[in-house]
Structure formats: structure tokens, C-alpha cells
């Protein structure tokens, strides 16, 4: 990494030097049972314990020599002038689906009154309950303001933010600022926009942009994996469509970030397999975790760029052999989540047994709860850093989902 390229990620397994996290905040306390599906949650984490688990995750990374950055801090540091701060507030409000002009005005006044930038950022993440706003004078109310709704929020919270992997993805020296699957999560990408536009270190054009949040097709970071300095993997999943992948790849190849080939994985379109990294992660030079349930229906395409056009070939051979050939190793071992037991595989995949964060070759952060998968990984010679995640896992994401590498050593 140089001062001109503050992002440097050319593998999934190179020693992790710098990573971005988001500590769960008050947005979690704005979850309620009636609206879990709307906010893409299945359950409500206990915030106090979720924060303790997340702090322990961050400390485990620091203990391994990783510098931990926080999304909320970088976003706050990006509001470098009053004009940029006001522009951020107005853009945030324009994307918040606020019902009623008077309500929008009241929220704007609330946000403008917050003097501390980090407090402002955290408030935008938490959302705004209607009960927080002052009573609007009858003369100022429009029809939308007058028609009462039982929905308690003037602005929805963003409870998925602690999964920092998805709103944007670091690829080589560049970043994919994603357009996400749901309206609920797409609002999260505003923080990445301001970081990579205005932050003193990461803004000002220092980081090439290979995808833009204003695109209309969807892509998420859990479907973007950097296998080596030459090869990327992308998932065609519930959250990422093929059209987005084509746009992303054209931009990556045109900007000459160094990649020569992309492996596109097409698999079942459902919530339990929402991203490629929930069923497939790289843990060593020649080892991957995989969820056995995707193996039968998996289709893989090799994508290269020739004469300013994408060249796409469907691969029909063995997946392990395909990976070995593309990574330049003699053989690749696919380690099944839950082993050969379908019950264990289903349970531990649901609890993100396949969603590992590799912080050095063969050194992997995992949830301690996935005991069968963890025992198999250890039997293969991997060093596991086990973290508690009983509350964090309720959001359906593991250590890789909760982290966005900013710098890795080359391998």
C-alpha cells in the first residue's frame, strides 16, 4: 500500500492489516417484532450483549495485529466542512422515504441541531421514531401529515449495518460502492459514498470506483470475493444479479486493477444462501469451506475480457479442480460445513459456519457455536480464533459478513 492507494486487497487470505467494522448501536434497539421482515431480521439481538460480543471480535483482531477502523468514525471524519455536512443530511433525508413535508422539515431541524459529527452519523443509523419529533402545528401539516399511520418510525433504522461487508467491497486498490437488494439496506451505502468522496485519507479520488450506488441493478459485498491477485469470485444469488456482475467486471477490467479472470457462481436463490460468502469462503492457499447443499445445483462460469468485451464460458468440470487450476496449486480441498451430516450442515450453515474470516493463511475467525464444522477445520490443520456470537448471529451473518478488509499483505 502507498499513500496514493489506501486500499490494498488482493486475496481472501493474505495477512489482514486493516479492517472496517461497525459496532452495533441504537439501530438494534429500534427493531420490533411486527417489522422484522421489513428490516431483514429474523430475531431481535440483545444490544448490550451484541456489543460485548462485537467488542471481543474487534479485540481478537487487534490481538492478531490488525488495525480496526469503524464505519461510524470514518463517516464522521468525512463531514469535513459545514457544506458537506449539510449536503449529507439533505441526501440522507432524500433517501429516507419520509411521509410529509412538515415531518421532513422537523427531522432536518433535529439533525442540523446535532453538533458532534459522530453523534449525527449514529443518529442517522439509528433512525427516527415519530415520538421523538415535536408536535407539528396544524397549519403546517399537509395531508400526509394529517393522515395518521400506526407505523412508529419517521425514518427506518439500519440494523444490518454491522455487516460492513455488503454496502461496499474493496477489490484490489478499488472499491465497489454497491446498489443493494432491498430499499432497507440500500440507504446504508451513503456512508461509503461520503468516505470515498470526502475522507482525508480515503476520499478525493484516491480509490478507483468500480461500481456506483446509483446503478439500478443490485450487487452486495457478500457476493464479491478476491481469490488472488489474478482471480475474483462473484456470486449470482438472492442479493446479486447477473446484470450487476457484468457492469462490475467491465469496470474492473477497464480500470486495469490487475485481475485476469472472474469465476461467477450461480446457486439457489433464497435467504439461507443469501450471499456466496454464506456458503463458500477461502481459508488457506488450498482450502475452502463450502455448504454441501449448494454443490448439486451450483453452476460456475469463467469470465475474461478480450477485445473490450466479456468472454463467458460455463465450466463443467469438478469445482475443486477448477479452483486448483485457477489458483496455481496442486489440489484444492473443499471442507463441508457440518461434515456429511445434513442436519448439522443445515444448522451450522444457518449459524454461519461457512462464513469465516481468514486473517492469515490457515488462520480463521469463526463463531464458537459451530462445533462440528470447527472440529473439522481444526483437523485439517487450521488455527481457529473462536468468538462468541449468540446475539450477533441473529442478524444472519458471521465474521466475514461483519468485516471489510482495507489492507492485506500480498501472498
UniProtKB/Swiss-Prot annotation:
Keyword Cytoplasm: yes
GO BP annotation list: arginine catabolic process to ornithine; arginine deiminase pathway
EC class of the enzyme, as a word: hydrolase
GO molecular function, one term: arginine deiminase activity
Sorted UniProt keywords: Arginine metabolism, Cytoplasm, Hydrolase
EC number: 3.5.3.6
InterPro entries (UniProt xref): Arg_deiminase (IPR003876)
Catalytic residues (UniProt): 401 (amidino-cysteine intermediate)
GO cellular component, one term: cytoplasm
Main location: cytoplasm
Membrane-spanning parts: none
Location in the cell: Cytoplasm
Catalysed reactions listed for this entry: L-arginine + H2O = L-citrulline + NH4(+)
HAMAP family found in the cross-reference section: Arg_deiminase
Protein name as catalogued: Arginine deiminase
Encoding gene, per UniProt annotation: arcA
